[in-house]
Amino acid sequence: IKAIILIESLPAVFQMEEMLFALGEYAAGLNAARWDLKASILEYVMHDENFVWPDRFDVTIQNTEFMSNIFRRLVAICLKHNAVPIGGMATALPSRDEEVNIEAAKSIKADKEWEANQGFLRAWVAHIYHMDPAAEPFKKLRESGWEPSEDMKNPDNYPVKIENPTGKLTKEGTRQNVRTLLEYVEGWLNGRGAKGIDRLAGRPGKRPALMEDLATARISTGQIAQRIIHKSVAEDTEEQHNTNTKEE
């Protein structure tokens, strides 16, 4: 048996090497579980009024330096111990509209190109339909002869430091959290632990549904609660979040 460890909680970030050691010969690698990790970090800091997070889709791995560093550290630990670093999940689901699938493939490729350049060797997908665009950037980079530098293999170059992400805090972001959470709970009550959800349903434009699971429910609930607890002011409406905030 070979196991890949999902790094999806803040305590796990500080124990990555120890977990590989504990599994010994059964350890295959580490996986960067993006949304679960974001949810875990938010849950640990949500009591602090100085750590009120922006809208969740503004908190990307690429533009949030402390998150990037966590995953670069994951890669370094894997490369140091000859384990396989696995990138995040491409959550787009296939559509009957080919135009939507083409746009999803472009987005997936761009995301996986970034991961490949950080030293990740593989990634995973929510649906096999998108396996090829997710795998292509890793194959191309390796076939080019590119190899991770020695600096990329040293975990000490990537210390863990939790900071507040930058981005907009909007009422629209809160509405999207409420909408997504209600859809997820509906699916969960009907026996589905994961569900394809378009958080912008009813809005102009074409986009794929994304596979959402408990991580989405956790971070959506956490953000709604945090904004109400700290009476955060929305940038788009200049309104204060409170228990009377309603979905329009």
Question: Which residue stretches match the model-derived regions?
Answer:
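Conserved alpha/beta-domain cores
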Residues: I1-E248
